[in-house]
Amino acid sequence: MDIERTLDAWLNDAEFAENVAFHQLKPARQAMFEPFPATIHPTLQKVLREKGITALYSHQAEAINRLYSGENVVISTGTSSGKSLCYSIPILNQQFLQPGATALLLFPTKALTNDQHKSFSEYAKALPVETIKPAIYDGDTPSHQRSAIRKSATILMTNPDMLHQGILPHHTNWARFFSKLRYVVIDETHIYRGVFGSHFANVVRRLKRICAFYGAYPQFIMTSATIGNPAELAQSLIEQGVHLIDQDGSPKGPAHLLVFNPPFVDEKLGIRKSSLDFGVTFTLKLIRAGHQSLVFARTRRTVEMLLTYLRNRLSNEERDLARGYRSGYLKTERREIEQGLKSGRLRAVFSTSALELG
C-alpha cells in the first residue's frame, strides 16, 4: 500500500483523526538542471555520466562555479538534494589540476564519514588518477594504519574532536598534508551553535593558523540544513566571507507533515496516553502497511525501550525487521543497521541523534 492510501485510511478513521493536531501537504517540486561547468575535467564528466549523473542541479553548478571563482560557499538546501556533489566534484577535479592536492572533510557522525568514504573510494577506482587516496582518520582507525594515512592520504575524512586532539597538536607529522591543503569541507554546519559552536570556531582558527604556517590558504565548503541564518553562522565559524547558496534545484516529491496528540486516557484530568506507546503503535501500523520508518528519541534508554515495546508486539518472523541505533553499538553493528536501512531490509529503526544528521 502506498503512503497516500495509508494516510487516507488513517485520516478517515474517526478515532485516529481526532488526535491529528496539524496536517500540511508540502507540494512536489520539479528539478532545475544545469550542464556540467567547463571547469570539470572531461574524464571526470565521463565517469559522472557512467554513474547516471548527466547534468547537475542548479545549486550544485552554482557552488562549483563559485568555488572556481575563489569564493567560500555554504550550501543550505533540503535533505537528499545532492549537497555532497558540491564538494566531491571540486575535490576530485583538483587532482587533475594539481595532483597530490589535499582536502579535509569534517563530519559530525561516523555514519556520514563512512558514506562519503565509500563514495570517494568508488571514484578512486573509476578515475585514472593515482593521487585520489581517500582515508578515514578517527577513533576507529587502527593504529597500524595511521602512519600510512599521514604519509599518503589526499582526501582525509575525520571529525572535529579528532582534528582538535589527534591532528592539529601533531601538525608536524602532517606537514605534507597541510602544505597542499586546497579545500576544507564542514558538513552539517548548523549543528555548530552555542558553546559547542564557539569551541569549534576556535578549532577552525587553529586549523587556519597551521595552514598558513605551511603556506596553504584553503577554501571552505560548508553544508547546512535549511536554517534562518546559514551565511551568518558560516561566516562566524571561519571568519571569512561566504557566499550563500540556498535555491534548491533538486526535485522533491510531495510530503505530508503531521503532528499528533496521543489520545486521552482521562479527558477531565487532561491525562493522555504515553507518547512512547503511541509512537510504537504508529510504527507497528507503518510496518504492517509495508512502509519503512525512522523514529528518533532523545536518549539511548528511550531507544532501547521503544525497540523492546515494538518487538513485544511483533511476531517472531517480524522481530528482525526492527533495530535500534545509538552510540555504544559496535562499529560492525552500526554499519549493518545503516545498510539495512538503505536496502529496505529493516522496516523500522529507533535512533538517537546519532543517525539524525545527513
Model-derived segments and their meaning:
Residues 84-85, 101-122, 225-230, 300-301:
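Conserved Walker A/P-loop ATP-binding site and its immediately adjacent core
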Residues 92-115, 129, 212-216:
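Conserved SF1/SF2 helicase motif Ia
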Residues 145, 329-352:
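Conserved helicase ATPase core of P-loop NTP-dependent helicases/translocases
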Residues 139-182, 340:
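Conserved helix/coil segment N-terminal to the catalytic DExD/H
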Residues 1-61, 69-72, 132, 319:
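Helicase-associated low-complexity/disordered flanking segments
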Residues 112-136, 236-242, 314:
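Conserved helix-turn-beta segment of the N-terminal RecA-like "Helicase ATP-binding" lobe
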Residues 102-105, 109-113, 283-313:
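Conserved strand-helix element at the start of the C-terminal RecA-like helicase core
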